[in-house]
Every structure is written in structure tokens, then in C-alpha cells.
A protein has these predicted regions:
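ABC ATPase C-loop
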Residues: 152-153
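Conserved ABC ATPase signature
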Residues: 135-139, 143
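Helix-to-loop junction immediately C-terminal to a conserved catalytic motif
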Residues: 52
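Short beta-strand immediately N-terminal to the Walker A/P-loop
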Residues: 34-35, 84
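ABC-type ATPase nucleotide-binding domains, specifically the catalytic core motifs of the NBD
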Residues: 16, 34, 72, 97-116, ...
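Conserved ABC transporter NBD signature motif
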Residues: 60-69, 80, 113-118
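The feature captures the beta-strand-to-loop junction immediately N-terminal to the Walker
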Residues: 37-39
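Conserved structural motif at the start of ABC-family nucleotide-binding domains
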Residues: 6-8, 21
Length: 157
């Protein structure tokens, strides 16, 4: 049986006393691809923000690789390899494409490996290589989504 990577149990999130997410439960095992699907306002983004430490939990627990991550902040979770690709474009528009990719590797200290990983991102997303020194704000929406995915992958989730 594949290892459980993420386990969400009884997740609850509230905004100013209003219950935005109540009782969400699921597991993600190694090798699985999971989507959160629902109507506008159903709590999909709120759930992801709670998992990645950007929103506090009102109840429940979240385990990553068998350990509770409840109450940990986003940078602590990135260091453990848990990242989220934003629903929107989520790029730093006043930074170059290369600088955006480097932000994904910010927590790592191995410069040689980072250089190899940037080259790998340019292989996966060749359109980014062509414009690597341009500001991310000059990119189309689809290109910005590619960049956001590349930046998330640079953190080696």
C-alpha cells in the first residue's frame, strides 16, 4: 500500500465567526493525483490555504508525512516540501522569470543543484527560457501559470 502523504481530518476554518469549512476529511497517498472540486464559495481555496499554513484552523488536524502540521506557518511547511500552486497566476510581476524561479528554491543552499533545477524548468517549460530575463508582468496569463508551477517545483515538494 502506498504511503499516506497528506491526511486531513475534521478540518474546520472560520472567518469572523462564519464557518467557511466544516468537517473536511481526505487522504492523499503517494502516486495519487487529487482535485478539490466544488461550486464557488464551497471552501476549496480556503481548505488549501489552511493546509499550507496561511489560514488558522478552527478545528481538526492535518498530517503531512505522518506528523501533525497544525499551527505551522507557510515557510515551515515549504521547508518540509509542502507547497501550493496558487489558483490565480501567483507570480511576482516586478521580478524576472528567472528571479521568480529562484524564489521557489529560496530555502535550499545547494547552488549547483539550483542551477541544474532551473535548467530543468527551462527544459520542461521552454517558453520561459526564451523570456528568462523579462519581467513576469509582461507574460500572458497562461505563461504566468507555467511560471507559478515551475516556481513550486523548484522548492522540490
Amino acid at each position: 500500500m502506498a504511503q499516506t502523504l497528506l491526511k486531513v481530518t475534521g478540518l474546520q476554518v472560520a472567518y469572523g465567526g462564519i464557518q467557511a469549512v466544516k468537517g473536511v476529511e481526505f487522504e492523499v497517498r503517494e502516486g495519487e493525483l487529487v482535485s478539490l472540486i466544488g461550486s464557488n464559495g464551497a471552501g476549496k481555496t480556503t481548505t488549501m490555504k489552511a493546509i499550507t499554513g496561511t489560514l488558522p484552523l478552527a478545528g481538526g488536524d492535518i498530517e503531512f508525512l505522518g506528523k501533525s502540521i497544525k499551527g505551522q506557518g507557510p515557510w515551515d511547511l515549504v521547508k518540509q516540501g509542502l507547497v501550493m500552486v496558487p489558483e490565480g497566476r501567483g507570480v511576482f510581476t516586478r521580478m524576472t522569470i528567472t528571479e521568480n524561479l529562484l524564489m521557489g528554491a529560496y530555502i535550499r543552499n545547494d547552488k549547483a543543484a539550483i542551477a541544474q533545477d532551473i535548467e530543468k524548468m527551462f527544459t520542461i517549460f521552454p517558453r520561459l527560457r526564451e523570456r528568462k530575463d523579462q519581467l513576469a508582468g509582461t507574460m500572458s496569463g497562461g505563461e504566468q501559470q507555467m511560471l507559478a508551477m515551475g516556481r513550486a517545483l523548484m522548492s522540490q515538494p
